[in-house]
Amino acid sequence: HGTYTPGTATYSQMDYMLKVAGFGNFHVGTIEGYPTFETMLAQLKAAKAKSVTLVPFMFVAGDHAKNDIAGEWREMLEKEGYTVHVRMEGLGQIPEIQKIFVDHIRFGLKHRTQGIMEKKAVYAAGEKNE
């Protein structure tokens, strides 16, 4: 999906990390923010790609995935001459991602949240005991 907030930087970082890891045929584009559709399209052209598989990088492949990715993006890429395939599966359908979420929930249930003021008090108390 993307965002117009500074958090958009994570998407270009993901694109960079994929390429550094050897996945040069993966390109990240966002509906809102950066990298834009045009940025991704330029990468596809530079790579001389003939076909594209669009995969939503969202937990649930809902309306945005259907309307924007499987709809508008698919149409725009087809107009550019690409053969386009769409994999309408959200990240939440992937067992490994489900496991990460369950592990985080279990961790949260076992450990209580500690506020910054409480942490500072612990640090201050530790310094006094030295």
Located regions from the model:
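Extended amphipathic ligand-handling, pore-lining, and cofactor/metal-binding catalytic surfaces
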Residues: 1-130
